[in-house]
Amino acid sequence: MLLMMDVKDFHLINEFWGYQMGNEILHYVCKRLEAFPKVVLAGRFHSDVFVAVIDVSGEDFDSCRQLIDKNNHMIASEVLENYPIQYFSMNTGIYYDLNREENTEKIISHTNTARRKAKEQVEGICAYTEELQQAELRRADVLHSFQSALEKHEFLLYFQPKISGKEAEITSAEVLVRWQRSDGEIWAPDRFIPVLEECGKVEQLDFYVYEQAFQWMVKQREQFAGEITLSLNISPCHFRNIEAFTKKLLALIEEYSIDTRYLIFEITESAYIRNREAVNQMIDIMHQYKIRISMDDFGSGYSSLNTLKDIAFDEVKIDKRFLDGSLTEKGRIVLQEIFHLLKRTGKSIVCEGVETKEAADFLIQEGCDELQGYYYYRPICMQEFEEVVKVKNAVPLSV
């Protein structure tokens, strides 16, 4: 069995306690690994990463995993006892079967993949599997083909219409993105967005989507009377540099002469909770340019009703979990209370995940401003959306 291990957040130890203590801790960890039961070979691989080859003859995987977990806890306890740091933990990647017919380079690569994945696990331990490797290959595929895909315009805008609760017609749409691969396969966002977020590339995609959406707004303004409001998503990465984001966005809005009355930007409830100060700062700037901001996924597990009276959002988008399954009497009461508070604080209400006539009728009766969901429309491509808008709402300028 091959183990590859690293120290969680080791850079913080160096920054706070200094490189000398950091090196002392690494030497200590290395000695403890050399004393690991049935160890054949152990050593420092690079930086704060260690490797160890363990003889697990006659041991099943579960027993080995328990042994690793026990050893990691023991090392952590000893480090905390011998050094003045307050937190210490390790990530461990496991390659269990060294008898498989793979060369050393591949085995090390697979173990390293498991180590990186271990950072996402609560216990900090992950074993290599074929499924894990396939996920890693898909991740690499996304990263290596992303820039080329942008240049080739493989990312397509999709639109999910929103229906007015009063007029029962399309008044706006949420802009979504799909990736049409070179082989024609269309990827949903969950195939590539998490990877782009993790690697800091989602900002490029966001601004690609914004520009494509603004170009569409210009085109439809020239072809039809009236305007369709578009909702665009803001990724959490932009909260790291509010000034740069808003400056770039406002320049793009000015370039295409976009009437900001027809723009809404959505920020998820979870992003707001994690970046409250930055989000409020962004909202203040957006409001100066008459741009509305919507809280997306409200009620997905973070906010309380009390927070609604204090937030500066113009619109609140109720999470579809409120409408999952049938609307119970208790569910109706909760939604009524939320609607009542939102109306009193002057916020617009959008409900997503509307999938039944029962839900639609109830929401309209309670004064929901806009409804979105499969009962009305699934996300549709640009051409189909244009046809829907043309038939449902738009009047040609020649009339």
Regions found by a protein language model. Name each.
Residues 55, 182, 235-240, 262-276, ...:
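EAL-family c-di-GMP phosphodiesterase catalytic domain
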Residues 30-34, 63-82, 209-219:
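Alpha-helical scaffold within the catalytic cores of cyclic-nucleotide enzymes
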